[in-house]
Design a protein with these regions (language model features):
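Active-site bordering "gate/hinge" segments
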Residues: 1-215, 364-366
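Short solvent-exposed loop/turn micro-motifs enriched in small/polar/acidic residues
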Residues: 157-159, 227-229, 264, 293, ...
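Dual-mode signal for accessory low-complexity, basic/Gly-rich regions
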Residues: 245-314
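Extended hydrophobic packing segments that form well-structured cores
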Residues: 319-366
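Short, glycine-/Ser/Thr-/acidic-enriched flexible segments
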Residues: 58-60, 103, 171, 180-182, ...
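Active-site lining segments that contact anionic ligands and/or coordinate catalytic metals
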Residues: 213-215, 231-233, 240-243, 266-270, ...
Length: 366
């Protein structure tokens, strides 16, 4: 299909978590500090400004039981290799899309009561519904959905909120925004006018908060699957934009490694609004997959921000982006914080508040 669409060249790369597990289990220490061929390929591709389609087919527990020190060291070294080269993709300068496909480890973790064949069939059915493929006219369904998201991101940008207030079980948080916030989501457009959807499915409208303006406590409402490890029942305490305390019922060591990665990994780079009435949330699943979990409910990302979520941000240098409050990190980890019990209000310059999310649903009409 890519060639039929006019591509000059198509490169297919396979990444296997079992190979990574073998690296950490049997490789020498140097293997956990080496730059992988995968990272070299990605860095080269990003530098060349290629479009890419990533098929996320991951076992959320692929690296369970592996020494987090070895995994964390590998993550840090390899993230640093691709970080600068990835800047154009984070700035939405070239088209890219992430989708997901079932693999045994993933389907069995989501549907543990079923045999593999039944679990796989159920997963494909859920994916088709979440991606609106089951609709009589999927293309028209997507056009309608993207138009709704576009109206909502225009509304939120026009309101010029200075902060977001989160309230829910275990959550009492204020996240300050930058001085010129822009909300994005759904279909986005490159500077050359090429539209694309970074995520399929997509239910979110998001912005990048100010890196120094978060305070309070927030609790995750779903597990975070990160590099083959599962972090569960976790929370953050924020002060002056930084995580100053945290805890987890499972995967606390992995969480600690994420937070300690660099100067921006313990700060927020994204705040996204997602309603519980969306097509992903309607499945009622704990997906254990970042793409699906982040489009299931509101989320906040640790780490790197999106320059396009600041007015004129794409044209700023890295130092200028930092100066206006856009966070920078080799990490971008989406933490799901929304549910039917969580509400988010936008704070206006005069201190008054307006509902954005009320008990998990949109609190405004766009």
């Amino acid at each position: 299909m890519a060639y039929e669409g006019g591509a000059e060249d198509v490169e297919v790369q396979w990444f296997d978590a079992e190979v990574d597990r073998s690296r950490f289990t049997h490789g020498r220490d140097a293997a956990s500090r080496a730059v992988s061929q995968r990272s070299r390929f990605l860095a080269s591709a990003f530098e060349d400004g290629v479009s890419y389609l990533r098929v996320s087919a991951e076992d959320p527990a692929a690296l369970a039981g592996i020494d987090p020190e070895r995994v964390g060291g590998f993550m840090k070294v390899n993230n640093e290799v691709v970080f600068e080269a990835r800047a154009g993709h984070m700035a939405l300068e070239v088209p890219w899309t992430v989708i997901a496909a079932p693999v045994p480890g993933w389907t069995s973790s989501v549907f543990p009561e079923d045999d593999l064949a039944e679990a796989t069939e159920r997963m494909w059915s859920a994916i088709f519904r979440a991606c609106r493929i089951d609709q009589p006219d999927p293309v028209e369904a997507w056009r309608t959905h993207l138009a709704d998201l576009a109206a909502r991101k225009r509304h939120l940008t026009d309101r010029r909120y200075v902060a977001l207030r989160y309230r829910g079980p275990g959550t009492d948080l204020e996240v300050g925004l930058t001085d010129r916030p822009v909300w994005d989501g759904g279909s986005v457009t490159t500077p050359e006018g090429r539209p694309f959807c970074p995520n399929i499915p997509t239910e979110e409208v998001f912005t990048s908060p100010h890196r120094d303006r978060a305070s309070g406590r927030i609790a995750a409402t779903k597990p975070l699957s990160y590099f083959g490890a599962l972090i569960e029942d976790f929370w953050f305490e924020m002060a002056d934009g930084r995580v100053v305390d945290s805890g987890a019922g499972g995967g606390a060591d992995v969480l600690a490694r994420i937070l300690a990665t660099d100067g921006g990994s313990a700060r927020f780079g994204e705040a996204a609004m997602v309603p519980q009435s969306g097509a992903v949330a309607a499945e009622g699943l704990v997906w254990k997959n970042t793409l699906y979990d982040e489009n299931d409910a509101c989320h906040i990302a640790l780490g790197s921000s999106y320059p396009t979520c600041f007015e004129g941000g794409a044209a700023l240098s890295p130092d200028e982006r930092l100066a206006v409050g856009l966070n920078q990190s080799v990490v971008h980890a989406d933490v799901v914080v929304g549910s039917s019990e969580v509400s988010v209000h936008g704070v206006l310059p005069d201190g008054s508040k307006e509902p954005i999310i009320l008990a998990g649903e949109w609190g405004f009409t766009a």
